[in-house]
Amino acid sequence: MSARVGSAARVLVSLLAIAVVAACGGGAQPDQQRSGSGGGFPVSVTGKFGTTTVPEKPVRVVAMSWTDADFALALGVTPVGIAKAPDSPNGLEPWTAAALGDAKPTQFSTVGSDPIEQVAGLAPDLILATKDYNLGQSYQQLSQIAPVVTYAGAPNTDSWQQALGNVAAALGLAEQGRKLTTDTEAQIAAQKVTHPELTGKTFSYVVAPTAAGVYTVNSDQDVSAQLLAGLGMRLSPKVLTLPTSGLPGRAQLSLENLSVLDADIILVAAASQQDLDAFAKNPVAESLGAVRRGAYVPFNYTTAVSIAFPSTLSLRWAMTQVVPKLSAAAKA
């Protein structure tokens, strides 16, 4: 995402800032509306910064985040420019790279700010920025280049269903967007049916453990928690009662208080394997029932990102990576 860089410190901040959604519904929210979205043009989409009108079918699309690129690619549209995923050596998350195939769009960095001149040089006729964390500073300049599809509230509060719907409408592919949403939701629901062992299992989810302590998800409105809920699991009641830290949807715990994390399954996402190993070897963590049973599921950075910044592409990838590990933990 635009707010992330490759350094370990900023990677940790990114994990801590994993999105907390305002609502999990798939339709457009009251503050973001679409008109003319049946496939004809012009199309209007209203978002945080006003109403964006797309006068005709776009042919040169620029994606200001890899999630926006995912939305376009899933709809069969290959952007001419894509913001780099800073944690990846080739600038692409694996699911994005797979969808691109042999296509090689221009990549650009959005670390710290959006590259206005580089975007302008791509001569876009549509800019997708539903997950652009720099947009508050760059919208006015970007909107002078081409119509900009934005978020309704914030890049981390619009659901993936809502963002996909707006991107699809702007591309004149509203019906395809609705089908993608339905198909992806059905795939998640099918995993729940296939893996009944997950239903009712409690979980806690630690993000960015350090030598000083950990942050843990304490909101069932967190997007990752919602995905797991869609599989039949539920966030541990013990962590739901923890006081929120300065990061929304996150509680902070010192290492000596890790016992509150015990649940049927413990998930841990970290920026490096070293951090994951350090958590697992902590004496208090080792004493947790879930860890002793083998119901401890470590997530590397890419896996955490796939469910923290969801798109139809990332979620389908995540199902192949996450569900088998959860199933094994549930049976431990």
Regions found by a protein language model. Give the residues of each.
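C-terminal motif of bacterial Sec signal peptides marking the signal peptidase cleavage site
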Residues: 19-23
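Bacterial lipoprotein signal-peptidase II cleavage site
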Residues: 24-39
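Basic- and aromatic-lined ligand-binding clefts that recognize polyanionic substrates
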Residues: 62-64, 68-75, 177-239
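A short, structured surface patch at a secondary-structure boundary
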Residues: 68-118, 131
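Extracytoplasmic ligand-binding site segments that recognize negatively charged/polar headgroups
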Residues: 87-91, 135-137, 153-166, 200-227, ...
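Proline-aspartate-enriched helix->loop->beta-strand connector
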Residues: 116, 123-129, 147, 258, ...
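Extracytoplasmic substrate-binding proteins
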Residues: 137-211, 308-332
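Structured C-terminal subdomain patch of bacterial secreted/periplasmic proteins
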Residues: 261-332
